[in-house]
Amino acid sequence: MTAWIIWGTALLAYGLFRLWYDNWSGPLKPAEIDAFLAQMAGRFEGTGNSQQVMRAFLEADDGREFVMLNLVKAQMEQVEDPKTGQMVQGFDLLKRYSQRFMPALFRNGGHPGMVGRKVGGYIDAWNTEADPDWTVFGLMRYRSRRDMIKLVRDPAFMEGHPDKLLGTLATFSFPTQRVVSFYVSPRVTV
């Protein structure tokens, strides 16, 4: 009887995990994409990003998870804290942004795959811009493109966004999907 309880509890826990971890809503609908882009109007141009690139990414939604590759050049100089008015290191504001971003990412079925700091210059690069002295990189797993939209609309994320802007001198991000990986998914390890 005890074995049944243990295995039953384990199966229930795994089932609940999969309900949270996997996308059960399918790809985005055109109306969802239009509503999101209308809400974000004006935000793309302020950072030099393209609404057309975002639209193409959202319209190509296959309902699967993706991993965002983020390269960040952090602001290591002093900047004015928008909350206190005091001078703080920009990198501290970037860390404060991360403290808001991570819970919102988890709530939406995402998690970091890997975050690290840069330890050298470009080793293999051609036909690309010069290294802007990236500081950190992150691989952030998103359950779906819909969840990315929900995260961007999350009030905690939106409130923390000024910290990201002040704590970041440059950033370069693009979505990816796994082709080959020795990273074992939590679907297997949980």
Q: For each of these PLM feature ranges, what is it?
A:
Residues 2-134, 177-190:
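Short S/T/G/P-rich N-terminal loop/turn motif that feeds into the first structured element of a domain
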Residues 80, 144-157:
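Short amphipathic alpha-helices within nucleic acid-binding modules
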Residues 128-141, 145-149:
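Acidic, glycine-rich flexible loop segments
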Residues 152, 161-164:
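Short, flexible helix/strand-to-coil boundary loops that buttress conserved ligand/catalytic motifs
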Residues 168-169:
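Catalytic cores of eukaryotic secretory-pathway lumenal/extracellular enzymes that build
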